[in-house]
């Protein structure tokens, strides 16, 4: 205590007081929380010691900073924590006086609180007293969650049963004397976000019995219509009566409406504060790719894989999501999932002219069965392959299909791309990473946009995108030409992309001359049928493709129904009304497809 100078008392509670102090050497302000032990019950004493031990172990950028702690003369537990100049959220709501917070600010606060709770829940810690007066604001209006006096450490499958907390923020299962878990904190957080949004408590009554009745029935007033439907629905999902139907903190962080704010937090957070893994730097989080106007430029890409799980989401800027298109996956703190964000400049497609030629070097990613960093192997320094793009309309969209595939396997276009094989590329053979120049619409199960779904051609095994060349060096090297044409429809705009790959086999070696002859025959047959290949699209007369499309539609509809997203389900099924598509015809061709498949 000799190291600190007491400035003033800033708070007082039933079990102690809070003092504003200044460190004599650092000249920095802190908060001294003194919890009285004398004339207290054993439970209160245990709670004070537990808070001291717990706050000393947690480390998260959105939880109050721990500085020091000690027991003073056996009568007080003293805890030194970081000082938040912005006060607590309850004071901020009172100062608002009818002037609502912006949705952007509320979403940022919600993401920070969810990350704090996700960190606690991943470490089996229940806060049990999440309320606006325990949410503090820093000078730059960032969130700090504090007051762990009622926190409880659970075992892996344990539940809490003690009725503790603030009545207005208690969940229905706690009031019903039912054992509760981490979803109780989600309910309390939902009450806080509701209060921050509506500037009034979610549940308020004149007596305790009426309050309990409102909470158990989960009766809340409508939120202000100035906020988007997605944001209001997100708050309502946190206030569902059944804890099984409430999303967890990790699931809420993956909600499409919060993705821009999650990305901002990842970029701003320090690696030392447990949001970004220590082996990654914030600079590596987002890689922008732009092409200069010169006709020749060299692009060097580098990709790392931290496990055998790959989560890729293509997103496109929209009025509601004003941020750079990114490929991202969100780190789940309870597991060892990797965080990989790749940002693609939107101007990439527009800057590539119809006759611009550029060279690329790509790397092959070795997939390992365990969650260990995989090796990145780059190809030797050779003459890089040349790729030319002809732009027919204002945009280009390229798709990629695996080279090695079985005869009957047809991948649905909406599924994620498979990982590259662990095969090391040979000299003279180069693969082109089209994903690095790809601009794709935002189409996902969690955020359906029917008008943005592109029609991807379902390539078959006899239509490989690149022709592998295995040839022994001959006295007079002959370049092989492989022409690949694919036609893709996106936003009512026809795009034809021509891939011309020239492989100079000066250093390449083959095992026999048969490989070279087969490659030449395949190239000639490809050139002969290029006209018909250019026009390939989704074949509406194909029973198998239509059956797969309908299967995907039904799966999509079932998932929307299960998540109670009825508005999006209505948009999805609207084209299949009585005046739109005949259910009878649909049943006929579906039955035919089943019969043919059975044969």
Swiss-Prot record:
Domain Protein kinase: 4-258
UniProt-listed InterPro entries: Kinase-like_dom_sf, NEK_Ser/Thr_kinase, Prot_kinase_dom, Protein_kinase_ATP_BS, Ser/Thr_kinase_AS
E.C. designation(s): 2.7.11.1
Catalytic activity: L-seryl-[protein] + ATP = O-phospho-L-seryl-[protein] + ADP + H(+); L-threonyl-[protein] + ATP = O-phospho-L-threonyl-[protein] + ADP + H(+)
UniProt keyword annotation of Kinase present: yes
Tissue note: Expressed in anthers, pistils and leaves.
Reported function: May be involved in plant development processes.
The name this protein goes by in its record: Serine/threonine-protein kinase Nek1
Originating species: Oryza sativa subsp. japonica (Rice)
Encoding gene (name): NEK1
